[in-house]
Design a protein with these regions (language model features):
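Short, membrane-interfacial amphipathic segments enriched in basic
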Residues: 1-11, 151, 194-205
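Aromatic- and glycine-rich beta-strand/loop motifs that create alpha-glucan
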Residues: 1-31
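Membrane-interfacial helix-loop-helix junctions in multi-pass membrane proteins
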Residues: 17, 48-49, 182-236
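Residues that define the loop-to-transmembrane-helix transition and helix capping
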Residues: 22-23, 56, 98, 166, ...
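Hydrophobic alpha-helical transmembrane segments of multi-pass membrane transport proteins
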Residues: 34-39, 55-126, 171-174, 179
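Transmembrane helix segments
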Residues: 39-46, 159-201, 205
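Transmembrane helix-loop junctions in multipass membrane proteins, especially transporters and channels
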Residues: 40-49, 78, 85, 120, ...
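Alpha-helical transmembrane segments and their short interhelical loops
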Residues: 97-172, 219-238
Length: 238
């Protein structure tokens, strides 16, 4: 119980910092939203995905891109706390050591939820529609939370070990780029063989395919198990 209480206090501290500068949440949501608008209104007409509205195909990948962008801020916040000596100060106090990290992790989850909601609202305005029911939406939420949790624990590593702010955030760049080499924007069968092999065997593709299947009542096959395995595996390794 003490660990939970300590975590809730430190989570509240991190959330208050974010609420004082909500522009960080908005900024992280705006960049993926701008990419979504560009692909839908500039490139969407030239991309054949088998859907009536390209935003329906695109949305899962945009959400994953937003999550990857957002966790860079988690690494930066951790780095800032380390540089200011707050970690050492917390560890000298009678609080659970794990609660310091869990406070940041929970803040990442909540702030990502806010960003995702903003993105979905914009997608609805430009034509996104889903046939998913409550169970499917809850399943999508669960997968996104698990993916966010996995990447957040990855972000903890550079946050604690980086030598500069740029170093703390730089790890997220490859993660942001991964959706571009996946099924997030175009079907993988349109890609050259070497690229297709990579795209079909990296985590974003299985997660995107799972979310897309849940949102539009399409067959998922083994994608959901592969997606869960990736998320759990990344979390355990991190």
């Amino acid at each position: 119980m003490k660990a939970i209480r300590d975590t809730s206090i430190l989570f509240g501290r991190s959330m208050r910092h974010i609420m004082r500068s909500p522009d960080t949440i908005i900024t992280v949501a705006i960049i993926p939203i701008m990419i979504m608008l560009m692909f839908v209104y500039v490139l969407g007409g030239a991309i054949q995905t088998g859907t009536d509205n390209y935003v329906d195909y695109l949305l899962p990948g945009i959400i994953l891109m937003a999550i990857a962008s957002r966790i860079a801020y988690t690494a930066v916040r951790l780095f800032t706390d380390v540089q200011k000596g707050l970690f050492q100060r917390f560890h000298s106090m009678p609080i659970s050591r794990s609660s310091v990290l869990w406070g940041h992790v929970l803040t990442s989850l909540v702030s990502n939820v806010i960003s995702i909601v903003l993105i979905i609202l914009v997608a609805l305005l430009i034509g996104f529609r889903s046939s998913a029911g409550i169970v499917e939406w809850l399943s999508v939420a669960g997968i996104l939370l698990l993916f966010t949790l996995a990447l957040t624990w990855v972000a903890v590593i550079p946050g604690l070990t980086a030598k500069s702010v740029d170093g703390a955030s730089a790890f997220s760049y490859p993660l942001i780029f991964l959706p571009f080499i996946s099924s997030a924007f175009v079907p993988t069968d349109t890609m050259p063989t070497a690229v297709r092999v990579f795209a079909e065997n990296q985590p974003v593709t299985s997660i995107v395919n799972t979310i897309r299947g849940l949102l539009y009542s399409e067959p998922i096959g083994n994608d959901i198990w592969i997606a869960l395995a990736w998320c759990v595996g990344i979390t355990v390794v991190a």
